Amino acid sequence: DSCGKTTHIFYTAPFYAFEDIAYLCPECIANGEAARIYDGSFQDDFSVDDGVDDPEKLDEPIHRTPGYSGWQQEYWRAHCGDYCAYLGRVGARELRALGVLVEVLDDPMWDEEQKDMIRESVNGGHLQCYLFQCLHCGKHLVWMDFD
């Protein structure tokens, strides 16, 4: 919709704008053109982790990074003073298979009850975990929400 170029790859997930946008090309997302043209965003600027002091870095997840679909409000994790890469939907089984379950539980965001929920989560279930990875140190983090 944004540039008019022919592409066989396009984005159809969340994009928040006044206009109803059918699809966006990856190039227009990456260079920020889609967000600029439609005055839209891929992520709510209040639904991101604290700890990123550089306001320029907020532009990346909001205007130049494809969002993901969650049950409730999507949330973008941060670590080492920067926003993380989103890796995908996971449950406890996938976290164990990747060898990162213990790592994601080592997160001050989660209390013991929430850690138990992560340990029992099922990918595609009523409690969904979303896996992120720090761009600087490689640490894995999750966000979770309910249907």
State what each model feature region is.
Residues 1-147:
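Preference for intrinsically disordered or flexible, low-complexity segments
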